[in-house]
Amino acid sequence: VVLDRIVAAARRSFSENGWAGTSMRAVAHDAGVDPALVHYYFSGKDALLDACLQPPEGFLESITAAQTTPMRARGAALVNLLLDTWEDPAAAQVLRSILLTAAHEPVARSRLESLIAQAMVGAVAERLDSDDRHYRACLASSQLVGLAFLRYVWCVEPLASTAREKVTAAIGPTIQRYLNGPLEPR
């Protein structure tokens, strides 16, 4: 419980104040713990940032599980996975802090790029049967990351308040085309 409070406080600080504006002492104060406890759990600010950049529990497993959906329905499955994850308040808080921290911190951005490349693009590409599977996985991932930013981070209307079924119906076929449809212009 104490560790969770420390990480939550650090996520808030990194996403609001950046690397330079976050101190171990300020994180301890925000978490309501003695600064020695923060140093007990984390050897330094790098280790604290690493903990903050860990995806929500079950996130990576969910991406892998979505890949077992029959190919004809995988686009919609990936959209629903994203919507399910972001509509879980605890997961959304973690993801939002990761994205906001990565937006202005080169170290966090590099780690997020690695996570996306391995967990998202890699997991999607692994189950595709085509020579351009990594390119296709990148296209699908770009659409999903864009959806997350517009709907959940920036709350752009009308997308932010559109019923999830309508979002899945609109974006699922695009993801599906990226996964196994024609990529040439029509």
Tell where the protein language model's regions lie, with residue ranges:
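Solvent-exposed, amphipathic alpha-helical segments
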Residues: 9-16, 97, 101, 143, ...
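Hydrophobic/aromatic residues within well-ordered alpha-helical segments
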Residues: 45, 56, 90, 112-116, ...
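Basic, helix-initiating cap at the start of DNA-binding domains
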Residues: 1-32, 43-50, 62
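Generic structural signal for hydrophobic core residues of well-folded globular domains
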Residues: 52, 56, 82, 86, ...
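Amphipathic alpha-helical linker/stalk segments
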Residues: 50-78
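Helical hydrophobic small-molecule/effector-binding pocket
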Residues: 71-97, 103-112
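Hydrophobic/aromatic-rich alpha-helical bundle segments in the mid-to-C-terminal region
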Residues: 109-114, 124-178, 182-186
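Key DNA-contact positions within bacterial/archaeal DNA-binding proteins
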Residues: 36
